[in-house]
Amino acid sequence: MASLSLAPVNIFKAGADEERAETARLTSFIGAIAIGDLVKSTLGPKGMDKILLSSGRDASLMVTNDGATILKNIGVDNPAAKVLVDMSRVQDDEVGDGTTSVTVLAAELLREAESLIAKKIHPQTIIAGWREATKAAREALLSSAVDHGSDEVKFRQDLMNIAGTTLSSKLLTHHKDHFTKLAVEAVLRLKGSGNLEAIHIIKKLGGSLADSYLDEGFLLDKKIGVNQPKRIENAKILIANTGMDTDKIKIFGSRVRVDSTAKVAEIEHAEKEKMKEKVERILKHGINCFINRQLIYNYPEQLFGAAGVMAIEHADFAGVERLALVTGGEIASTFDHPELVKLGSCKLIEEVMIGEDKLIHFSGVALGEACTIVLRGATQQILDEAERSLHDALCVLAQTVKDSRTVYGGGCSEMLMAHAVTQLANRTPGKEAVAMESYAKALRMLPTIIADNAGYDSADLVAQLRAAHSEGNTTAGLDMREGTIGDMAILGITESFQVKRQVLLSAAEAAEVILRVDNIIKAAPRKRVPDHHPC
């Protein structure tokens, strides 16, 4: 009996698209590797910057070497590339640094996987080998971690080293010592809480980056109203988000017909009376400072001035939220029950000058650890990149305060993990050993890229570094100032254990997810249905 051959049947809707097996895998690999190649030139202390230009009505220019910022601002269509972009964003949210490293490591793992699949090694065999390699690498990283949490002097030095290492690959590298000190002082003021909301960063054009400073207290980028006190001691602050243009019902497009101008004056008088009534309800709280998220308008401002109350209007939402946190108050919107409203407090409110701008300074706030870092710089792009760099350093330091374990940087940790994985591969029979070797090779690519970006002979340096670790020199790493192999413990090139651990685990998981893909199915685009019932 002749066998029937079934013709392939398309089960998808018209317009849907499917990529299978090798085609799907190749699409994923190409997209992920392209993302890694895009950001790898920014890796390390001598990494390059990217200029990001956006078009359209809100056209802007951004100069950065922050991996998460670059990936966040580029549009990607490849699904595997989107996985790496999301992973980089999570790395930024979780620990604040290592966004470029995690993307490059995942891309290098997939580059190795591509060559293994070309040798007919099954993806599941590769994944099994990678999982064992990840376990060995994590154990090697854990065993190399140093904890100085119980020694205050050594721990502070660790924080200085970590901040210096983080900032060395950023725009702030030329003012590294200055900003390292600022970041460490700001984080130590938090007293272990790790609440970065208490650290406010203000950017002001003018001067140079070296003119940036840490201010103990809170700065609000607003001006005090006309004819109001410019300085208040022992302030009681009511923070509000309320409309001061009376509580009238606004009827848009309505008209009022009157037979004389006296009637118009009566309407204005009635509105003023409602405003006055609201101001009186606010004053019953026994305050001497009123800060509103919305506009206050001239007449209520006059009333506050006559009562000797400082009134600040149109404070931005983030500023109001942070001010409520640091002064210990709550944001109110109704004022009928003064006993239920929690007021903020501080020892002194005064107007200060920074450059050519006036700001309001709150000192002696209820949240003692609150502080403001004022950034100065020649252009807005420099200030924006300085803020991103400083934010990364603050995030890493906050993580280190929670988990005080540290590891060595300069490619030392990657080489240490690669050495442990290679030793495991030598003891493992079968094809899984080949997958482990590829994992170790991907780890060794990170110091290779760091050396390449600095313009040194990466093959020679990485070979020397590998030999040093094979001989048991577990603190050897790349000294990019001299272009040689150095002792990371002596040079003080230290990184947070949590950052390195997160880079390792996230990259391995993302690479595994992409490697498992054997089909990419794109849904049919939605068709616009014509409107048969026009208005």
From Swiss-Prot:
Cross-link Glycyl lysine isopeptide (Lys-Gly) (interchain with G-Cter in SUMO2): residue positions: K248
Record-level Gene Ontology MF annotations: ATP binding; ATP hydrolysis activity; ATP-dependent protein folding chaperone; protein folding chaperone; ubiquitin protein ligase binding; unfolded protein binding
Location of N-acetylalanine modifications: A2
Chain positions with Phosphoserine modification: S3, S60, S260
Binding site for ATP: G44, G98, T99, T100, E495, K500
Signal peptide per UniProt: none
Catalytic activity: ATP + H2O = ADP + phosphate + H(+)
Subcellular location: Cytoplasm
In-chain residues carrying the UniProt-annotated modification Phosphothreonine: T261
Binding residues for ADP: G44, G98, T99, T100, S101, S168, S169, G410, E495, K500
Record has Acetylation as a keyword: yes
Subunit structure of this chain's protein: Component of the chaperonin-containing T-complex (TRiC), a hexadecamer composed of two identical back-to-back stacked rings enclosing a protein folding chamber. Each ring is made up of eight different subunits: TCP1/CCT1, CCT2, CCT3, CCT4, CCT5, CCT6A/CCT6, CCT7, CCT8. Interacts with PACRG. Interacts with FLCN. Interacts with DLEC1. Interacts with SVEP1.
Function: Component of the chaperonin-containing T-complex (TRiC), a molecular chaperone complex that assists the folding of actin, tubulin and other proteins upon ATP hydrolysis. The TRiC complex mediates the folding of WRAP53/TCAB1, thereby regulating telomere maintenance. As part of the TRiC complex may play a role in the assembly of BBSome, a complex involved in ciliogenesis regulating transports vesicles to the cilia.
Protein name as it appears in the record: T-complex protein 1 subunit beta
Taxonomy of the source species: Eukaryota, Metazoa, Chordata, Craniata, Vertebrata
